[in-house]
Structures are given as C-alpha cells and as structure tokens.
C-alpha cells in the first residue's frame, strides 16, 4: 500500500460495489467534489437521486442507484482517469469522448466540476476525473 489516499477512487469503488450487490442505495462520506460528481450523475440519468445526511462529522451522501427493467445498473462503466500519482488534463479542444459521445467525462475545471459537454460549451478544459457510460 502506497499510503496515498484517493477519495475519488474510493467513491467510484463504493458505487460499483453497491451496484454489483444490487443495493437500492449506498452511503458515501461527503465532500464538495463527490457531491458535484454525484450531481452530474443525477443530471445525466445515471442515478435515481441523492440526499445529504448529517452525521455530526463530514456528512454522508446517500446515493440512490438506478437499474433498468432487467435489473442491469444504469452505470455500465465508471473509470477513474486522473490519479494522485498521474494527473491527466485536457484542454477544451482535446476533451476525450466516451463511446462516441454516448457516455460522459467528468472534469474538474476552473469553473467547477462539470461534464465534457458543459466544458465544450464553456470552452474550458481541466483535470479529467472519470469516464462514465
């Protein structure tokens, strides 16, 4: 173990594991970044909903997972791109696409956390946090 913690990778692993276990929801330690990423997942239809829960500490995000009529998770792929040891950035002209635009890329930009489509609209680049399909 390297000793470097990566809260975003932990967040994504918790979502994946909860989906594999076909859970209705998962409670994840909250942060501004995770809240922003979860809001994007909600807006793009990858989760049902989420709520903030006060636990007298940092708080929790209760993320309600979404499944189709065949009990398949709405999130088919959730992949971390930029990591603490290897940051990856893209400018507005070179933003990656997921599955020819069917998926999304989540970026941390100077204007906040947003999807690749929003970043293109605003003409900004940033750190490529994750790919979702």
From Swiss-Prot:
<dbReference type="Pfam" id="PF00410">
    <property type="entry name" value="Ribosomal_S8"/>
</dbReference>
<dbReference type="GO" id="GO:1990904">
    <property type="term" value="C:ribonucleoprotein complex"/>
</dbReference>
<keyword id="KW-0687">Ribonucleoprotein</keyword>
<dbReference type="GO" id="GO:0006412">
    <property type="term" value="P:translation"/>
</dbReference>
<comment type="function">
    <text>One of the primary rRNA binding proteins, it binds directly to 16S rRNA central domain where it helps coordinate assembly of the platform of the 30S subunit.</text>
</comment>
<comment type="subunit">
    <text>Part of the 30S ribosomal subunit. Contacts proteins S5 and S12.</text>
</comment>
<dbReference type="GO" id="GO:0005840">
    <property type="term" value="C:ribosome"/>
</dbReference>
<keyword id="KW-0689">Ribosomal protein</keyword>
<dbReference type="GO" id="GO:0019843">
    <property type="term" value="F:rRNA binding"/>
</dbReference>
<protein>
    <recommendedName>
        <fullName>Small ribosomal subunit protein uS8</fullName>
    </recommendedName>
</protein>
<dbReference type="InterPro" id="IPR000630">
    <property type="entry name" value="Ribosomal_uS8"/>
</dbReference>
<dbReference type="GO" id="GO:0003735">
    <property type="term" value="F:structural constituent of ribosome"/>
</dbReference>
<dbReference type="InterPro" id="IPR047863">
    <property type="entry name" value="Ribosomal_uS8_CS"/>
</dbReference>
<comment type="similarity">
    <text>Belongs to the universal ribosomal protein uS8 family.</text>
</comment>
<dbReference type="InterPro" id="IPR035987">
    <property type="entry name" value="Ribosomal_uS8_sf"/>
</dbReference>
<keyword id="KW-0699">rRNA-binding</keyword>
<keyword id="KW-0694">RNA-binding</keyword>
